[in-house]
A protein has these predicted regions:
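Catalytic histidine-centered segment of alpha/beta-hydrolase-like enzymes
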Residues: 305-314, 318
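Active-site pre-Tyr helix/loop in NAD(P)-dependent dehydrogenases
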Residues: 69, 163, 308
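Mature N-terminal segment immediately following signal peptide/propeptide cleavage
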Residues: 43-49, 53-57
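Flexible "cap/lid" subdomain of the alpha/beta-hydrolase fold that forms the substrate-access gate
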Residues: 25-40, 50-52, 62, 86, ...
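Bacterial N-terminal signal peptides
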Residues: 9-19
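Bacterial N-terminal signal peptides that target proteins for export
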Residues: 1-11
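Conserved HGGG/HGGXW glycine-rich cap/lid loop of the alpha/beta-hydrolase fold
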Residues: 56-99
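Active-site helix-initiating loop/hinge in glycosyltransferases
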Residues: 68, 110, 312-313
Length: 335
């Protein structure tokens, strides 16, 4: 079995066209290797604007992790540590973030295009394998859409703090509570590269997203530096906002044709949706309405946790994810 696994990894490397000499050295990968319990490696798939940077640890069935905004691959470090002993954990920098490519056109961030890019990424990293897909925030919305589009490629789906993309648009169209929660979206969409730089918006965004977690010791000072560095580039912030500009129409203009994939049915694979009780990003009806999108849905609420469900209470989050993965006691054997 080990020989088969090594052959699969070699094939994935060949398909991805990896070059160790060409790979950048990510400070977050260096840090992960200093403090983590497993070796972490990085690589790239594709070139130019289509390049995807990924970080890998562990062996076993493949789990692909996709972060949201504003973030980068390291938001999944606690999950990679928890399950790297029995799963092949691969976290990607989403398009526009971290060391991945950064297309200049808003249209390049449409969910349909991102899903096709994710499909190529999965095919390169885990050829012939049905994977577990995990997403948070925009990465979660993308993961939902991918599962609706290509359910045959996935073994199961786990989502942290995110609705299906089509459901999010439905909620914006008909739920006043969701419109109120998303009132920030038009202001965010109005920002451009010039205003982002003039307003020093990356610094404000970092403090809003991660300042409290650092002050309370949820993230270490070093981890705070890594997130600050990852978010400091105005171009990266502009690319993150492009996800909003490309995929969220004016609320009153949302129609049945706005979502993707079109006419998506209810998926049948096992799905886990984890929310935080203090997260104000989505209306309280999210979990109930998500049941119309997934026949085999498990929902969980992390008490006292806000939007950053992967790391605010990693022990609770990992227990839920581990049980969902079918691990005895919710953890890797021997851990």
């Amino acid at each position: 079995m080990r020989i088969i696994g090594l052959a699969r990894h070699l094939m994935a490397a060949i398909v991805a066209g990896l070059s160790a000499a060409a790979a950048a050295t990510d400070p977050a990968v260096i840090h992960a290797n200093r403090v983590g319990s497993h070796p972490y490696t990085e690589g790239f798939i594709g070139k130019g604007d289509d390049r995807i940077h990924y970080v890998l640890t562990g062996e076993g069935p493949t789990v692909i992790l996709v972060h949201g905004f504003p973030s980068f691959w390291y938001v999944w470090f606690d999950q990679m540590e928890a399950f790297g002993a029995c799963r092949r954990m691969i976290a990607i920098d989403a398009p526009g973030a971290g060391l991945s490519g950064r297309p200049a056109r808003d249209g390049d961030y449409r969910v349909a295009r991102l899903a096709r890019q994710l499909d190529r990424t999965i095919a390169a990293l885990a050829p012939g394998e049905k994977v577990t897909l995990v997403g948070h925030d925009w990465g979660g919305a993308l993961a939902w859409s991918y599962a609706q589009w290509k359910p045959q490629q996935l073994d199961r789906l786990a989502v942290f703090s995110a609705p299906p993309y089509d459901l999010f648009l439905e909620m914006l169209a008909d739920d006043p509570a969701q419109r109120a929660a998303s009132a920030y979206v038009p202001r965010l969409q109005a920002l451009n590269r010039e205003s982002i730089e003039r307003l020093k918006a990356p610094s404000t965004l970092f403090e809003t997203a991660y300042g409290r977690a650092i002050k309370e010791g949820v993230l270490t000072a070093k981890e705070g530096e890594l997130f600050r560095d990852a978010l400091s580039n105005p171009a990266a912030m502009d690319a993150g906002i492009a996800w909003y500009r490309a995929n969220i129409p004016p609320f009153d203009a949302i129609s049945l044709r706005s979502g993707w994939p079109r006419r998506a049915g209810s998926i049948t694979m096992p799905v886990l949706l984890i929310e935080g009780s203090e997260d104000k990003t989505f209306a309280p009806t999210l979990a109930k309405r998500a049941r119309a999108k997934a026949e085999n849905l498990t929902t969980a609420m992390l008490q006292g946790v806000g939007h950053w469900t992967p790391f605010e209470d990693p022990q609770a989050a990992n227990a839920l994810l581990g049980a969902f993965l079918g691990l005895p006691g919710g953890r890797c054997p021997g851990s």
